[in-house]
Amino acid sequence: MGKGTLYIVSAPSGAGKSSLIAALLEQNPTYAMKVSVSHTTRGMRPGEQDGVHYHFVEKEHFIELIGKGEFLEYAEVFGNYYGTSRVWIENTLNKGIDVFLDIDWQGARQIRSQMPEAKSIFILPPSKEELERRLNTRGQDSDAVIAKRMGEAKSEISHYSEYDYVIINDDFDVALMDFKAIIRAERLKQDKQAAKYSAMLSALLAE
């Protein structure tokens, strides 16, 4: 059995990244694909579940895990720590399961420096106007927060060229097909196929 592939997925807020990942996983069995669940020191919000939305831990324990090198990447945001478990990702990949990591460009750089074999995908909105419309339609943020997110979006988008693949999420169904095509193509690469079908290849090449 071959290793799974780590997919780094980034996008400005409102581009549809989380929806695309969720739709992809809904159509595929969990033994083939999983989303990485980050550790965090922030409090649990209503409706959240430990181990589903985040692994909620105390700050002291998080700092202890940093010291042990347990995280592929971590960051402090508004006084709370967030980190990606190295052990969980490596164990999951070793089972032949693809892992999707929803992360910003800074975290993506940290991951790529340690796991250069990871594949990266950037999701773009078709326009600034459409991005702002989507943020307003969600009804989750105030005008001030939306203005802040739009400012952050320009910075995030400026790093699209650091990624292996770029998907334009204009039509959701088309973007999802593009997402699936990337995964399919990666699974058909020679090294993946050779590992998956080693016995068959040996038989084909036998005298």
UniProtKB/Swiss-Prot annotation:
Localization terms from the record: Cytoplasm
Residue positions binding ATP: A11, P12, S13, G14, A15, G16, K17, S18
Enzyme category, top tier: transferase
Cellular component GO terms held in the UniProt record: cytosol
InterPro entries hit by this protein: GK/Ca_channel_bsu, Guanylate_kin-like_dom, Guanylate_kinase, Guanylate_kinase_CS, P-loop_NTPase
Gene3D superfamilies linked to this entry: Guanylate Kinase phosphate binding domain (3.30.63.10), P-loop containing nucleotide triphosphate hydrolases (3.40.50.300)
Keyword ATP-binding among UniProt keywords: yes
Domain Guanylate kinase-like: 4-184
Reactions it catalyzes: GMP + ATP = GDP + ADP; dZMP + ATP = dZDP + ADP
Regions crossing the membrane: none
Cross-referenced Pfam families: Guanylate_kin
Pathway named in the protein's UniProt entry: Purine metabolism
Gene Ontology molecular-function annotations: ATP binding; guanylate kinase activity
Keyword Cytoplasm set for record: yes
NCBIfam families xref list: guanyl_kin
Family to which the UniProt record says this protein belongs: Belongs to the guanylate kinase family.
Functional description taken from the UniProt entry: Essential for recycling GMP and indirectly, cGMP. (Microbial infection) Catalyzes the phosphorylation of dZMP to dZDP, when the bacterium is infected by a phage that produces the substrate for the synthesis of dZTP (2- amino-2'-deoxyadenosine 5'-triphosphate), which is then used by the phage as a DNA polymerase substrate.
Protein name: Guanylate kinase
Gene that this polypeptide is encoded by: gmk
